[in-house]
Amino acid sequence: MTISMLQSKIHRATVTDANLNYVGSITIDEELIKKAGMLEFQKVDILDINNGERFSTYIIKGKKGEICLNGAAARKVCIGDLVIIVSYAQMSTDEALNFKPKIVHVNSKNEALE
C-alpha cells in the first residue's frame, strides 16, 4: 500500500503574471523548480493565500523570479497574490516515516531564502 505525502513546496511565492490566453499550467522560475526538487510537467497544487483558491495544474520552466498562472488558472489568481506551490509523492508507510519534504521559502522577488 502507498500513501500520498508532501514531497516539496515553494512557500509564499508572489504571482508575477496571469496569462489567460496561454494553453495552461504554472510557469515557475527554473531555479525554484530545482531547489524544490520538482520537475517540469509535474502535477502540482496551487494554494492562493489571498483568496483561498486551491487547484491543480502542471509546471513549466520560467525566467528568474517568474510565477505565472496560465490558461484557465489565470482566472483563479491576481497578480501580487501569495501562493503555495505543492507537490506530492506516493510512498510506502515505511518510506514516509523517514521522509523529509523540501520546503523552499521565498522573498517578495521570488528568490529562495535558503
From Swiss-Prot:
UniProt remark on cofactor binding: Binds 1 pyruvoyl group covalently per subunit.
Keyword Cytoplasm: yes
Reactions catalysed according to its record: L-aspartate + H(+) = beta-alanine + CO2
Swiss-Prot/TrEMBL keywords: Autocatalytic cleavage, Cytoplasm, Decarboxylase, Lyase, Pantothenate biosynthesis, Pyruvate, Schiff base, Zymogen
Modification comment: Is synthesized initially as an inactive proenzyme, which is activated by self-cleavage at a specific serine bond to produce a beta-subunit with a hydroxyl group at its C-terminus and an alpha-subunit with a pyruvoyl group at its N-terminus.
Cysteines paired by S-S bonds: none
Binding sites annotated in the UniProt record for substrate: T57, G71, A72, A73
Cited SUPFAM superfamilies: ADC-like
GO CC entries: cytosol
Protein's UniProt name: Aspartate 1-decarboxylase
Protein species of origin: Campylobacter hominis (strain ATCC BAA-381 / DSM 21671 / CCUG 45161 / LMG 19568 / NCTC 13146 / CH001A)
